[in-house]
């Protein structure tokens, strides 16, 4: 299989399938896809705290009692299919969107909380 074929296959995968692929690769090769964290000095830590965070991860922490409405809302904001959205909601806590702008994150959070879900911006 050529590199281009692999890239094309990845492009055609859903978010849920990509997540499963990453987990399988981590398990198979004994590695972690988490970004390495560098230890910074005290001066750098103080400067970083002063910066306002511009990108947020939208995390569904609990579906609440109206699971069907939450699944519909998740499909709307993520573009996932019914099966993928249901699996995501059933598996809460799960990240719905990574590196979302503050406005997008707040809009997604408001839409999901409107139907009874509990959502965090991290």
Curated annotation (Swiss-Prot):
Gene3D superfamilies: 3.30.1390.10, Single helix bin (1.20.5.710). One of its GO terms (biological process) is translation. The keyword ATP-binding does not apply. Keywords: Ribonucleoprotein, Ribosomal protein. GO terms for molecular function: mRNA binding; structural constituent of ribosome. PANTHER family: 39S RIBOSOMAL PROTEIN L12, LARGE RIBOSOMAL SUBUNIT PROTEIN BL12M. NCBIfam families: L12. Forms part of the ribosomal stalk which helps the ribosome interact with GTP-bound translation factors. Is thus essential for accurate translation. Belongs to the bacterial ribosomal protein bL12 family. Homodimer. Part of the ribosomal stalk of the 50S ribosomal subunit. Forms a multimeric L10(L12)X complex, where L10 forms an elongated spine to which 2 to 4 L12 dimers bind in a sequential fashion. Binds GTP-bound translation factors. This is Large ribosomal subunit protein bL12. The gene is rplL.
